[in-house]
Amino acid sequence: MIISASTDYRAAAQRKLPPFLFHYADGGAYAEHTLRHNVSDLAGIALRQRVLKNMSELSLETRLFDETLSMPVALAPVGLTGMYARRGEVQAARAAAAHGIPFTMSTVSVCPIEEVAPAIDRPMWFQLYVLKDRGFMRNALERAKAAGVKTLVFTVDMPVPGARYRDAHSGMSGANGPMRRVLQAMTHPEWAWDVGVMGRPHDLGNISKYRGNPTGLADYIGWLGSNFDPSISWKDLEWIREFWDGPMIIKGILDADDARDAVKFGADGIVVSNHGGRQLDGVLSSARALPAIADAVKGDLKILADSGIRSGLDVVRMIALGADTVLIGRAFLWALAVHGQAGVKNLLELFEKEMRVAMVLTGAKAISEISRDSLVRELGA
């Protein structure tokens, strides 16, 4: 199969993966309107094409939290990444580090912090959920610090899990889920051998380290689901801000008032995100929410954005709308599922090439030159 874009990796991943895994990552909440709008709204952002600007010198490099990034992209935290490729978190982290961008480890990764951090030559980021078990949260933070993590991504848009209908249909959850997952694995032998057999242990490594016993998919659905905390408030985050002395990013901001609260709280950054359309259907796409948030807090903290980004062109669009950097999730996961570390490496190269083309044709020689002026106003702002 010819791979020329992230959408090609998605098609290939759908063939390779058992349906319960493909649809778990591909699906969204309820009827998935926001999931679709994340992509379509971003694709509808029109850029101003500029010509005769002498674009012989071009730089994608940017600075973020005292880190140099080869381009304004980081790999987003994705739960169960290690179920999509053998020791998937390690492979994805290595590809990101080799390209000069951050990898963000999920709380619910298969590989534990202690396995991934030593595998790369730059500090990774760590994502943490708000959970009722504060002991686990403190344990995870202490272990992240010990592993050299500098940047914490704190996800605040999951006080309860979203209603994801696809999971029940695919076998990820619901009646006879375990039996359906086994049958699906049997009909996908390449995945069954590479990940199902050779990728063991199929463990939630960070949780197992804390609990002292192996955890599996049932624990992911059970223990974690029952531990999300709907009572959380900004006050509950104060001890984390005091404990964590590195950059702290609040992920899951869609409203300008919440962005202002993040500034008051002392956050170093926010992620404008609707969790990839996986939490509340009908909320704004990240592309539509971003401009108002940027107007409210640009310059007070760093603004990151995710949800719907499928190409380097989309990265340029998000930056023009007000982001400093973006996170990509599904796009890298599909590449990882198809070709492992080499797939993520190729995907990042594709994103970089697409960014370069977009910047040349919009007359932006550096990331700092991408702005609202890069947009066709009546269509993109």
From Swiss-Prot:
UniProt keywords, alphabetically: Cell inner membrane, Cell membrane, Flavoprotein, FMN, Membrane, Oxidoreductase
Gene3D superfamilies cross-referenced by the UniProt entry: Aldolase class I (3.20.20.70)
EC number(s) per entry: 1.1.-.-
Class in the EC hierarchy, top level: oxidoreductase
Lipid bilayer topology: Peripheral membrane protein
UniProt GO BP: aerobic respiration; lactate metabolic process
Residue numbers binding FMN: 106, 127, 155, 251, 306-330
Name of a matching Pfam family: FMN_dh
Localization: Cell inner membrane
Record-level Gene Ontology MF annotations: FMN binding; L-lactate dehydrogenase activity
Catalytic function, reaction form: (S)-lactate + A = pyruvate + AH2
Residues annotated as binding substrate: 24, 129, 164, 278
Cofactor or coenzyme needed: FMN
Domain FMN hydroxy acid dehydrogenase: start-end pairs: 1-380
Function per UniProt: Catalyzes the conversion of L-lactate to pyruvate. Is coupled to the respiratory chain.
Subunit structure, as described in the record: Homotetramer.
NCBIfam families: L_lactate_LldD, PRK11197.1
The protein's name: L-lactate dehydrogenase
UniProt source species: Pseudomonas putida (strain W619)
Organism ancestry: Bacteria, Pseudomonadati, Pseudomonadota, Gammaproteobacteria, Pseudomonadales
